[in-house]
Design a protein with these regions (language model features):
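Elongated scaffold/linker segments in the mid-to-C-terminal portions of large proteins
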Residues: 17-167
Length: 168
C-alpha cells in the first residue's frame, strides 16, 4: 500500500523489515528449474503460501491445472501459456529466469521436463515451464496438482525495496 500511495521511504522500510525478519533467501537457479519441485514446493524464498492437499483437489479446480503446461489435466496444457516475444527478448540471457520459457533455438539452454525432450520439441516457442506438477506427475491430478501455491516471495520484497529507493 505504501508503494501505491507514493510513500516510498515507508515502502522501502517495510520491505527491508520483511526481508530481515523472514529469514528467507532468494531461490537458486537449480530450485527454480527443478522439473519435479520447481514452483510447486515451498522453498526458503517463500514467505507466504497456500498448501492444498490431494483430498481437496479436483481435476479442473486446482492452480497447477491452470498454470502448468506440463500437466495433462486442466486447461494449461490446452492453451499452452506463453510469454510475448517482445518481453522475452527484453530479458538478458544472463538472467536464468528467462529459461522458464522455451527459446525458439532450443539449444540455447538445457531445458528439463519430466515429459522428455521429444515433448519439449513439439511445444510452441516462449511456452512457460515455470510451474511444474508435484513430483513431475503430469498424469494424476490428485498427485501432481497438490502443489504449494506461492503468494509472497522474498524476491518481491527486494523488488519493492529497490523500486521504492529508486523513487525516493
Amino acid at each position: 500500500v505504501y508503494m501505491w500511495d507514493g510513500q516510498f521511504a515507508k515502502a522501502a522500510e517495510y520491505a527491508r523489515k520483511a526481508i530481515d525478519k523472514s529469514g528467507a533467501t532468494p531461490m537458486s537457479e537449480s530450485q527454480w528449474h527443478n522439473p519435479t519441485t520447481g514452483f510447486n514446493t515451498a522453498t526458503s524464498a517463500w514467505m507466504w503460501y497456500l498448501h492444498p492437499t490431494a483430498s481437496n483437489m479436483g481435476n479442473l479446480a486446482n492452480f497447477i491445472g491452470h498454470i502448468s503446461n506440463e500437466a495433462d489435466w486442466g486447461y494449461a496444457s490446452l492453451s499452452k501459456l506463453q510469454m510475448a516475444r517482445s518481453l522475452y527478448d527484453a530479458i538478458p540471457a544472463t538472467d536464468f529466469r528467462k529459461y522458464s520459457y522455451l527459446d525458439p533455438d532450443r539449444s540455447t539452454y538445457a531445458y528439463q521436463s519430466v515429459r522428455g525432450n521429444a515433448w519439449l520439441d513439439e511445444q510452441p516457442d516462449y511456452m512457460s515451464l515455470k510451474f511444474r506438477p508435484v513430483g513431475g506427475d503430469y498424469n494424476t491430478y490428485s498427485v501432481g496438482a497438490a502443489a504449494d501455491i506461492p503468494v509472497m516471495r522474498v524476491e518481491e520484497m527486494y523488488l519493492i525495496e529497490a523500486e521504492a529507493v529508486g523513487a525516493s
